Regions:
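Short basic helix-loop element that most often maps to the first helix and adjoining turn
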Residues: 15-32, 59
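A short, Lys/Arg-rich alpha-helix, primarily the initiator
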Residues: 1-23
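Short, basic-rich loop-to-helix N-cap that marks the start of a DNA-contacting helix
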Residues: 49-62
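Short C-terminal boundary/hinge segments that cap the last helix of small helical domains
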Residues: 65-74
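Conserved hydrophobic/aromatic packing and binding residues within compact polymer-binding modules
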Residues: 17, 31-32, 42-45, 71
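Recognition helix of helix-turn-helix/homeodomain-like DNA-binding domains
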Residues: 36-50
Length: 74
């Protein structure tokens, strides 16, 4: 069960991923390809509709060409 505090954190993480993707001028499709994850999975992450695993977060960071810790700078 996800409580309100966790939900806010998941949404903030998704917003950070979207912000970084847009800074890099990447489409969701391109970032998903670079991250080697499904486009729908990336969409759910950005919308804050899923709690991503550490491996998913790591894949997204790799796709963005950033260290994993950058995704948590929010």
């Amino acid at each position: 069960m996800i409580n309100n505090k966790d939900e806010a954190l998941i949404k903030a993480f998704g917003a950070r991923v979207r912000e970084l993707r847009k800074q890099k001028l990447l489409s969701m499709e391109k970032l998903a390809e670079l991250s080697e994850i499904d486009y729908r999975q990336l969409s759910y992450v950005e919308l804050g509709d899923t709690n991503p695993t550490i491996s998913t977060a790591s894949a997204i960071a790799k796709g963005l060409g950033l260290p994993l810790k950058e995704l948590f700078d929010f």
